[in-house]
A protein has these predicted regions:
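Conserved C-terminal portion of the radical SAM core fold
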Residues: 1-2, 9-38, 45, 50, ...
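Alpha-helix N-cap and loop-to-helix initiation/capping positions
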Residues: 5-12, 75, 79
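Radical SAM enzyme core and accessory elements
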Residues: 41, 46-49, 55-187
Length: 187
C-alpha cells in the first residue's frame, strides 16, 4: 500500500472482496500474482473465483526465463513468484479443484444464458465435470509427479460429488480417454 498514495492493505482488500461477493454473488473475481501468497489464500476463502499462477509480465517472459537482475521490462511487479505447478498443488492442498475450463465461453454460455444456469443451479452439471477433465489434462501434460499424485486423488474424491449418474459415467469415460491422449472434452 505504501507504493501508491491511495494504496490499501490486505485486510481492507479482503473486506472489499467479501463485500463484492455478497453484493454480486454470481460475478467472477480474479486475483493476480501481484498479491502475496498469504493475501491470495485469504481472498480465495472469501469468494475469488479465478487465480493466476506462474505469471510472467515482461516482454518474451514465457519464451525465455526471466533473470532476477533483468526485470526492467516487467509490466508490473509479481509478488507470488511460484510456478503454475506449485500454485496448482497448493490449491489442491487448500481443498480447491484447479480448473482450466473455458467451456462456457466456447459454448456461448455467457450473459443471460450463463445467469439462467447459475440461478437454476444447473451450472453444476457443467462446472465440476469440466473442472475434473481440465485438471486431468493438466496432470497428464504438465504436472510434476507429486502434483499428479495429489491431483488423481482429488479427481477420484470429487467424482463422487457429481450428482447425475449419467454425467458421472460420461466423465469417467472421458477421463480414461484423456489418459489415452485425447483432449478438449467439455459439457
Amino acid at each position: 500500500p505504501d507504493a501508491f498514495s491511495d494504496g490499501i492493505d490486505d485486510n481492507i482488500f479482503a473486506k472489499i472482496v467479501a463485500c463484492i461477493r455478497v453484493a454480486v454473488p454470481y460475478t467472477g473475481m480474479i486475483i493476480s500474482t501481484r498479491e502475496s501468497k498469504a493475501c491470495r489464500e485469504k481472498v480465495l476463502q472469501l469468494g475469488v473465483s479465478q487465480i493466476s499462477g506462474g505469471s510472467r509480465t515482461s516482454v518474451g517472459g514465457y519464451v525465455e526465463p526471466e533473470e532476477p537482475d533483468d526485470l526492467t521490462s516487467e509490466q508490473f511487479d509479481v509478488e507470488d513468484k511460484r510456478s503454475l505447478d506449485e500454485v496448482v498443488h497448493w490449491l489442491m492442498d487448500l481443498g480447491f479443484i484447479p480448473s482450466f475450463c473455458t467451456a462456457c465461453y466456447r459454448e456461448g454460455r455467457t450473459g443471460d444464458r450463463f445467469m439462467s444456469l447459475c440461478k437454476n443451479e444447473q451450472i453444476h452439471n457443467c462446472c465440476l465435470p469440466n473442472a475434473l477433465m481440465t485438471l486431468k489434462e493438466y496432470l497428464m501434460d504438465y504436472a510434476a509427479e507429486d502434483t499428479k499424485i495429489a491431483g488423481e486423488k482429488v479427481i477420484a474424491k470429487e467424482l463422487e460429488h457429481i450428482p447425475n449418474e449419467k454425467v458421472r459415467g460420461i466423465v469417467i469415460e472421458r477421463l480414461k480417454e484423456i489418459a489415452d491422449g485425447q483432449r478438449d472434452f467439455r459439457f
